[in-house]
Amino acid sequence: MKKAFLFTPALLALSINAVSTAHAYDRVYVFGDSLSDSGNNGRYTTDGATSQLYVEYFTQHITGTTLIPSRENGGTNYAQGGAMAINYKFNTQEQVNRYLNSQDGKADPNSIYIHWVGGNDIAQALEDAAKEKDPQERQKVAAGVVVSSATATANQINQLIKQGAGLVIVPTVPDVSTTPRFLETVLTQVLTPADYKELSEKQKEAINQTIHGGLKSVHDGINTFTTPNKEYRRLILEGTLKKIIEILSPNEVEAKYEKLLAAYNQASAEASKLTDTYNEQVSKLIDTKNGNILRADINGLLNEVIANPTVYGIQNTLGYACPYGVKINECSANMSGFAEYQSLFSDSFHPTPLGQKIMGQYITSIYIAPSQVMTLTQVNRASVKSALSSLDGHLQQLRNGGNEQGKVGVFGGYTGNQDKTFTLGSDYQLLDNLLLGAMYSNYKEERSPIADFSYAGRGHVLTAYTLWNYYNNGWLSGDFHYSRTNYESLTRTIQLGEATRREIGSTTGKQWGARITAGWDIPVTHYLTTSPIIQYAWDKGDIDGYRESGNNSTSMHFGDQDYTSKVGTLGWRVDTQLGRFNPYASVQFNHQFGDTSNKLRSFMNTDSSHASAVMKSDKQSTNWRQYTVGVNANLINNLRGFASVTRNDGNSQDPSYNFSLGINASF
């Protein structure tokens, strides 16, 4: 038996550009406090006039527009510094009401909404609780404020959902016990005498000056250190507390230090618990059934940064960058006393521009994640397209010089570039005008179909085909295929400050479908024929949902994906019969009748509410053209070869060029 090898099509440039980018929301509306305020009451970060906030970063990257404060004409950012969920001069309920009233009570379904509030509410809860002497009463008061505020927050989010909001991003509230303000509050309580209220104004002023002097010394001292991890951060914190005791009570250092440390630990635990209660209450009450909600885990991100800040480009997470006593709206990195090390906090409560950028990068990454994963609906077709392109070249050659009845043909080969595909096939000339065949393709590819998303794919394609020649000039071919591809190392790459994080998962994709193609050869000369082409292709595929292996703030899981493709094709081709080498050319016009966009549901791994966001891709190309030139070669005896190149025009889902090389033999 003679051996033959086929070099199947090389899909050299499979470039899926904006096929599955997220549905293009055109606006971002923001409700919240100073963390999100871009100019209504102020800009709460270092060099606020020129520094970009997380909401501005996100808006710019997703919509390509500039976020404007609501106090300006056309502004969509309603956030206000100092805002709480309820019961304050500035609150998010009033912000939401103002927006809805401006829209006749309806929320724009083509917009993104960010609702983030709670830090001031928890701080208020701690302040109110501190007025109570009884520990149980303190806990009761604090819990009451937190539950009421969290309930109001959830109700406002549900109000937006009920009125038609497209997508609501709901970040978790960061742990207030990690802020420098919390440490300063505890130290202030320690430095304030028990009979402070009974003192004269002059005595109070003297004590206040002493307190401010002590806090400034603590601030300046902390800023001389770096905190590369939680352990170092804790050591510096404990050293700070001990230094305070050494100044206040040099004769009772150890006893009073232990008492102060225990009091700090208890207060910190209570503040963390209140933060968790707030976040859990919001998660419990938001309408996850009807709402399209992305629950961004900012609290988890904060803890990750504190645990290993250096990789993000941050050197100090305990202190703050601005000089003590300088208001955040007036703080500049150029002023005297500004921290030498890159800090997480600008002042005692607000993040630095780098902290804002990290939050913006984080929310952007989890927002675009579904669009990255949706590219698999196009990637899943690559192995089939490679196999069928090879089959088309093989059948084209058989139409020009078929096998005799009873002959067996064999072809096989290897394709290598971005993908590597091994193909082995065989066919049998059952009648003088009827061919039956089958082939197997093994597919391997490692690539990045879209920015910051890559995979390793290993697949198998089984194809059965037939070719029927009738009335001398007519021909009809059909094929049926099934493919299964294992996607390993599905990797999302996420930039967070200077850190590069990767979230990894794996899944499986399947596709099955059929094609029928017909043509009629029209003789022009003895050496030249031309033919119309008509084709209909149907494909159905699915990709299993998968869960990324991590449990970080960026870790996600995704639902199942499925698609149906129905493509009709009209074309024309020209063939030559010159002898040993026979060039040919064709043009085809394709139209997609099936799915032109995809949907994908995504979840955050760390979210207890099971909130999910359904993202819809932009529409795919529905009309495109293919131009093919090639040559069939009669080599020696029963050995033949072919080569072709196809140019795709108007279809961003497919490669710009397909190259096919092949050799087949019959015996």
What is the predicted function of each stretch?
Residues 358, 362, 410, 414, ...:
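Outer membrane beta-barrel transmembrane domains
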Residues 237-258, 333-425, 432, 507-509, ...:
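Outer-membrane translocation/initiation segment of Type V secreted surface proteins
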Residues 27-39, 55-57, 70, 74-80, ...:
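Structural recognition of the beta-strand scaffold that forms the well-ordered cores
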Residues 1-24:
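Gram-negative bacterial Sec-dependent N-terminal signal peptides
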Residues 376-530, 538, 645-664:
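Outer membrane beta-barrel translocator domains of Type V secretion systems
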Residues 185-273, 285, 292-349:
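Mobile gating loops/cap/lid regions near enzyme active sites that modulate substrate access
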Residues 44-151:
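Conserved SGNH/GDSL esterase-like catalytic core that processes O-acyl groups on lipids
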Residues 123-130, 136-144, 180-187, 264-270, ...:
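Extracellular/periplasm-exposed beta-strand and loop segments of Gram-negative cell-envelope proteins
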